[in-house]
Amino acid sequence: MTFFGQDWGGLIGLRLVVDHPDRFARVVVGNTGLPLNTSLDQQIVDKVMAFREDGRRLGFREMALALSRLRGIGNEPDAFPMGFAHWQKFCWNTADMPAGFMMEMMINAPATWKVAPRVLLNQYLGTALRPITPLGRAYEAPFPDASYKMGPRAMPSQVPTLPTDPSLEAQKKAWEFFLQFNKPFLCLFTEDDPVTRGAEKSFIGRVPGTAGLPHQMLPRGGHFLQEFCHRELSAAISELISST
């Protein structure tokens, strides 16, 4: 099989490749990573932990502003944990996480005049952020009510951004595996992804299977590149399969 992982598809899926290497002939990753930060300054760790646990609730606007300042996990390894903690905290503390609204904002944001009143009402009155577009409603559809959102609320807190995170040993095991991985390993990332921009550097040149492959840094596509760059992704994956 050919593995393709984006976002959690890489965080979870790459460790699946580690556990079942015989099932995969090649690997393709896009806008994802396999973070392993074992040398983060203890002051930063303490600051992030205190922020996570201080009991203050974040609004959507504050969280979105913090994420907009990120330069990507591969470009700012020391600053990323604090910025990403805003996302972790918002998701964990928001019982009715606005999944559909957030997805439409990241993929194809509605006009500002439609969005701004909703965000302001949410910030000052606590009203729910409901999806505006058919795309947003489609992403909201899998959740009949807020009780079904516990998974996506908890998952950001499982991203191992600190050396104290519980998945550290599994990440070490995964990197020990991929540092010896000789099967084709192709990276397809985007220049405008605020979350994982720069993470391709952790793979290219370190994973033996990346050598000699036509890795791509696509000019645009946001975080969910499969929404905007599906033709480029499909062509690159098809070419990799036919040539290897």
Question: Model-predicted segments: where are they?
Answer:
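Catalytic active-site module of serine/aspartate enzymes centered on a nucleophile-bearing elbow/loop
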Residues: 211-244
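Flexible "cap/lid" subdomain of the alpha/beta-hydrolase fold that forms the substrate-access gate
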Residues: 1-4, 8-217, 226
